[in-house]
Amino acid sequence: DNGPSVQALLEQAAEKLTTQPTPVQGSGRTDAGVHATGQAAHLDVPIHLTATDVMRGLNALLETHQVSVVSAQPVAATFNARFDAVQRSYLYRILARPAPSALRRNAVWHHRAKLDATAMHEAAQTLIGRFDFSSFRAAGCQADSPIRTMDYLSVLQAGDEIHITARARSFLYHQIRNITGSLVQVGMGCLLYTSPSPRDFTE
């Protein structure tokens, strides 16, 4: 049991603040174990509540949880955080060393074996562009089309960590998680890439 979702916590707080059921729509899903920074969401509140009232009120109700609202502003009634998002970004932090980190335990993926970040980055560049990413979506993906455009994908060595950053307007369910797994296989020397096609990349 991973406990209530961030959306559920926000909706519970919003209902207390507005004294009525208040749905909260985020710009995208946040899977269990994922830390969301800069997540955008929208909700409808009574007109007498200012953006500052909403931010302060929600934070007061969320202070016992690991969720905080860092800013709020009024938007058009037609605004939708999910469908109006112009770009989404993922950052995977991999701690590539034998020993785990006590302080970063819940913020990084600990990988005991050394990884070749240069090879991983070169492989990542073949996935930039518009492709059929069927090979990288999870079985439960409900997207109508597997076609997505990867705007940016990089792999950088950052001290004892390897950072994988991906940016696109939208992603398939578990697309970046599965791409990260494949790039790690490249970094270990277990997987070679010879084609810019995502389908060939995993075969």
Regions found by a protein language model. Give the residues of each.
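Structured-RNA-binding interfaces characteristic of tRNA pseudouridine synthases
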Residues: D1-S195
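Single conserved hydrophobic/aromatic residue that forms the stacking wall/gate
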Residues: Y193-E203
